[in-house]
UniProtKB/Swiss-Prot annotation:
It comes from Pyrobaculum arsenaticum (strain DSM 13514 / JCM 11321 / PZ6). GO terms for molecular function: ATP binding; ATP hydrolysis activity; DNA binding; DNA clamp loader activity. NCBIfam families: PRK00440.1. ATP binds at G44, P45, P46, G47, T48, G49, K50, T51. Part of the RFC clamp loader complex which loads the PCNA sliding clamp onto DNA. The keyword Lyase does not apply. Keywords: ATP-binding, DNA replication, Nucleotide-binding. GO terms for biological process: DNA repair; DNA-templated DNA replication. This is Replication factor C small subunit 2. Belongs to the activator 1 small subunits family. RfcS subfamily. Gene3D superfamilies: 1.10.8.60, 1.20.272.10, P-loop containing nucleotide triphosphate hydrolases (3.40.50.300). One of its GO terms (cellular component) is DNA replication factor C complex. Heteromultimer composed of small subunits (RfcS) and large subunits (RfcL). SUPFAM superfamilies: P-loop containing nucleoside triphosphate hydrolases, post-AAA+ oligomerization domain-like.
Length: 322
């Protein structure tokens, strides 16, 4: 297996290599065909392809000269808007290499900038608009001021569907000579929730345990409870075998070294998959959220988990008797 970070090793280099995101690719291909584009704002959760798509667009626009014509900046890494201004000024001062009509600045984590810094960024974008285009990357659109939103074409990135994540993980596993079970893929997806970067990183971590990845090896490598074991524990608790369920949860924490907060997060996901009336699920979610909040405030983790399971059991038992 390669010692490189797999997420970087297998980062797509062209539109054709990008999984899913068909509508986004179609819009960006039009910009490439036209040879021009506006400022862009890519927004959406982490790991949904924003940085990858920005770099792919740079490669498609500039070909072999993409590095010379592209400046990557991270708003949280830079020492302030003055540093960004100076770097953009120096970058935009020279003409694009090749036949490109403009250069490209990719600014990650733009939503981490203060409002004042974003106002200054807006002026920088206007000042160098003649020969420079900006792609701003943000997790939260609410973190971007309206004057910047109005000067960009905004493109939303959503969490990737399970099928797309599975296909990419299988491709990487095959290339690295690793076997992975369907249950292991499910466990990775449960842990990462459509975040492709985290999913690939999780795959690489799990692969360090051997040439075959199972649900159990994923759980152990990522510090989570096996989803199968957690479902069995929930079923025990809700069928009234509370002593067995409590013993299992105690083992997850004490023997397995899994944090109570991680268990609560998994409980939330698994409990909402229960075959119960839909109107009960908000109540179940609220019970688990109360336990989560109490643990964050310093309450005893195991006690809160036991209490949440008992409340859910009581709720299910009561509604079944109506």
């Amino acid at each position: 297996m390669s010692e490189l970070f797999w997420f970087e090793k297998y980062r797509p280099r062209s539109f054709d290599e990008v999984v899913d995101l068909e509508e986004v690719k179609a819009r960006l291909r039009e910009f490439v065909r036209g040879g021009n584009m506006p400022h862009l704002l890519f927004y959406g959760p982490p790991g949904t392809g924003k940085t990858t798509m920005a770099l792919v667009l740079a490669r498609e626009l500039y070909g072999e000269y993409w590095r010379e014509n592209t400046l990557e900046l991270n708003a949280s890494d830079e020492r302030g808007i003055n540093v960004i201004r100076e770097r953009v000024k120096e970058f935009a001062r020279t003409a694009p290499v090749g036949k490109a009509p403009f250069k490209l600045v990719i600014l990650d984590e733009a939503d981490n900038m203060t409002s004042d810094a974003q106002q200054a960024l807006r002026r920088i974008m206007e000042m160098y608009a003649q020969n420079t285009r900006f792609i701003l990357l943000a997790n939260y659109i609410s973190g971007i001021i309206e004057p910047i939103q109005s000067r960009t074409v905004m493109i939303r990135f959503s969490p990737l569907p399970k099928e797309a994540v599975f296909a990419r993980l299988r491709y990487i596993a095959d290339n690295e000579g690793v076997k992975i079970s369907d249950d292991a893929l499910e466990a990775i997806y449960e842990f990462t929730q459509g975040d492709m970067r985290r999913a690939i990183n999780a795959l690489q971590i799990a692969a360090t345990t051997g040439k075959e990845i199972t649900e159990e090896t994923v759980a152990k490598a990522l510090g989570m409870v096996s989803p199968r074991l957690l479902r069995e524990t929930l079923n025990d608790a809700f069928r009234g075998n509370f002593g067995k369920a409590a013993t299992q949860i105690y083992g997850f924490v004490v023997d397995g070294g899994i944090g109570e907060l991680e268990i609560v997060k998994q409980l939330h996901r698994e409990a909402l998959k229960l075959d119960v009336p839909e109107y009960l699920k908000p109540e179940i979610a609220y019970i688990i959220a109360e336990a989560h909040y109490a643990i964050l405030r310093g309450a005893h983790g195991l006690t809160q988990i036991y209490g949440a399971l008992a409340k859910i059991r009581k709720l299910l038992k009561y509604t079944a008797s109506i």
